[in-house]
Amino acid sequence: MKLEGTLLVVKDMDASRRFYQNVLFRTVVLDLGAYVVFEGGFCLLTEGQWKEFLDNKPVSHGYGNNVCQLGFEDDDMDAFMAHFQKFPEIKQLTPLKEYVWGQRSIRFYDPDGHIIEVGESMTVVVKRFLRSGLSIEETMQKSMYPREFVEMCAQALTNSP
């Protein structure tokens, strides 16, 4: 068995679809009106359709309950942050910050209060450490990533022009 995707229940499909397309650069691969699938396997479904799927049982939606998130990675956080600033109406949960393992990320809400995280890819983080002069061992310790991954990133740096 394999996981096939994540489904988010939304109140306003048009607003949610625009958000994911315009803010997060997601591409729609299937649009059935009440059900939209984006590249990468996550889907949006209208609240009304969700209720029908549940045989009209009450839906205890926890919009904005801060208990789960969709996570995205970007190889250029500075460019993403410049893009993100074009959407002042988006409610931020956390500012852009760097965690102890070196990854920078920001968290904010989609139109229905689902948490969205956009963070640097760890490949970018590890390469940044290596470029700064950290050794393989120091990079492993700081990033908390295994030797094989750090060495793969180091090799990629060696092979790049």
What are these model-derived regions, one by one?
Residues L3, L8-V9, V29-D31, F80:
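Helical anchoring/docking segments at protein termini
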Residues M1-A15, C68-L70, S121-S160:
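N-terminal beta-strand motif that seeds the catalytic metal site of vicinal oxygen chelate
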Residues R107-V124:
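A contiguous, mid-protein "functional segment" used to position or interact
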Residues T27-G64, I115-E120, N159:
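Conserved short beta-strand elements that form part of the metal-binding/catalytic scaffold
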Residues D12-T27:
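Amphipathic alpha-helical segments
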Residues F25-D31, K91-T94:
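Short secondary-structure junctions
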Residues D12-D14, N65-D112, S132, K142-E148, ...:
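Vicinal oxygen chelate
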